[in-house]
């Protein structure tokens, strides 16, 4: 059981974090995510806490976003040392359904003129679950050889990913203060709770033969790796330098998640029969994942008539410093012991895997138009679009993380009556199709010597012991739906009407 091949686990685990899709909340999503300056509902605790100062009285928000994510991978044929095709692979697709992303928050001024306080709970706006087949044409079982041992029955993407669940919830406590008529500031404390489950395979001999597979499960057989508490913070400000103009900005410093739990490693029956053993079984480990600086900024222009906002347009930019997320670490305690009759014993204390991620930026343009009297209430129409630069270089492309270049278009509507607002939103994200021919993901055998950091299979001296597993065609398509309920209780209960 080569130590080097296990490092592929981290390549998949690292990308379980993903990036958010634009964007949280029914109003903001329908505007293409352009909300850093407007921030006039309780999703301000996600975009810009200074926006809480705009919201008087006591309020409640319950929004639900729903992510329909479709991923596919057509692995490139496996070639022999002379370049002849040894094996062709079927295209595989993710089998997940619609993933819900709830958002709940409440706020009150508690009778104070300048202060607003809020509390809420939400998660990243992304699909936390991704599932791909383990087997092709047969039902998977729970044995060390889940597809029966026949090579053609094993899914071609199994070395990248078969299943992952990455769930993070931010319990948030925030406050905003109106410094002056033209300036609001806000800050918040967040309690991050996170869980990880991941399953994939690696190969002990640098081939694609299932007889050499090792199945890896972060979270063990039935559990999860858990980080029960990591503190996070956010600050923001909104300025109104001229009539009808707002400028907003917010920043969240980086944070480090430390997921503790079991790691189960199951060698194939062939490897077990040949004397490969891994202990302890299951192992105990900590998966260390870093989340980057996130800085948002936006400027908007709006028009009001007798205190009622009739229309607005906003342009936002977001910067995420993913280059500082340089490694993902898996720390074993106690150390992992790998015994092999052929290769002897080795001890593993920590894997440290480089990411290759780059800083990324995005632009969001959106706005709304409101009709003051439609029946007993007001009707708001919203639309927007966005562009996001890639986080993930082409040679680091794989299935656990889709930080690719993408474009989005969105639209939605809302109806408000006596302090109660019902909102709907829809967005579609177009991802670039990625053709990868020089992947950094491979299986390899320490008998031949592992590649140095940054090498690919073409750099390995004895390439027969190195098999590229990430070359091929990657496609992604995302549909986002949102519904929302907002209640302003002071307006709802106003009996003077």
Where are these regions (language model features)?
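Bacterial N-terminal signal peptides that target proteins for export
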Residues: 1-5
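N-terminal signal peptide c-region/cleavage motif recognized by signal peptidases
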Residues: 11-14
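Outer-membrane beta-barrel porins/channels
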Residues: 17-35, 99-497
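Outer-membrane beta-barrel translocator/receptor signature
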Residues: 39-47, 53-139, 155
């Amino acid at each position: 059981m080569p130590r080097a091949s296990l490092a592929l686990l981290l390549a998949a685990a690292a990308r379980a974090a993903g990036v958010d899709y634009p964007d949280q909340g029914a109003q903001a999503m329908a505007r293409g995510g352009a909300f850093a300056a407007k921030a006039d509902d309780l999703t301000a605790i996600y975009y810009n806490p200074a926006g809480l100062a705009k919201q008087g009285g006591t309020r409640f928000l319950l929004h639900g976003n729903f992510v329909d994510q479709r991923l596919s991978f057509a692995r490139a044929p496996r070639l022999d040392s002379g370049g002849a095709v040894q094996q062709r692979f079927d295209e595989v697709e993710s089998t997940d359904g619609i993933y819900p992303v709830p958002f709940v928050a409440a706020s009150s001024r508690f009778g104070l003129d300048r202060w607003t306080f809020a509390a809420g709970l939400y998660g990243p706006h992304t699909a936390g679950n991704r599932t791909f087949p383990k087997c092709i044409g047969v039902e998977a079982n729970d044995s060390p050889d889940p597809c029966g041992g026949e090579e053609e029955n094993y899914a071609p993407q199994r070395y990248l990913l078969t299943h992952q669940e990455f769930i993070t919830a931010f319990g948030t406590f925030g406050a905003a203060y109106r410094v002056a008529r033209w300036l609001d500031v806000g800050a918040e404390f967040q309690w991050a709770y996170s869980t990880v489950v991941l399953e994939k395979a690696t190969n002990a001999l640098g081939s694609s033969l299932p007889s050499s597979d090792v199945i890896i499960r972060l979270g063990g057989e039935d559990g999860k790796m858990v980080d029960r508490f990591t503190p996070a913070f956010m600050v923001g400000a909104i300025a109104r330098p001229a009539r009808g103009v707002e400028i907003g900005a917010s920043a969240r410093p980086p944070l480090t998640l430390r997921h503790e739990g079991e790691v189960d490693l199951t060698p194939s029956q062939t490897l077990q029969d040949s004397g490969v053993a891994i202990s302890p079984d299951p192992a105990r480990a900590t998966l260390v994942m870093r989340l980057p600086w996130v800085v948002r900024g936006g400027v908007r222009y709006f028009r009001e008539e007798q205190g009622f906002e009739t229309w607005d347009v906003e342009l936002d930019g977001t910067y995420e410093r993913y280059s500082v997320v340089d490694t993902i670490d898996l720390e074993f305690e106690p150390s992992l012991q790998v015994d092999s009759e052929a290769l002897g014993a080795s001890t593993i204390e920590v894997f440290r895997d480089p990411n290759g991620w780059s800083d990324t930026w995005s632009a969001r343009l959106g706005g709304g138009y409101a009709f003051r009297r439609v029946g007993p209430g007001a009707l708001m129409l919203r639309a927007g679009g966005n562009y996001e630069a890639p986080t993930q270089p082409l040679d680091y492309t794989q299935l656990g993380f889709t930080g690719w270049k993408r474009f989005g278009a969105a639209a939605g509507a809302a109806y408000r009556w006596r302090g109660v607002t019902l909102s709907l939103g829809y967005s579609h994200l177009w991802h670039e199709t990625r053709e990868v021919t020089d992947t950094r993901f491979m299986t390899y055998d320490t008998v031949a010597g592992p590649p140095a950091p940054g090498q690919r299979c073409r750099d390995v001296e004895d390439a027969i012991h190195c098999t590229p597993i990430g070359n091929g065609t990657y496609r992604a398509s995302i549909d986002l739906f949102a519904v929302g309920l907002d209640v302003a209780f002071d307006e709802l209960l106003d009996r003077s009407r």
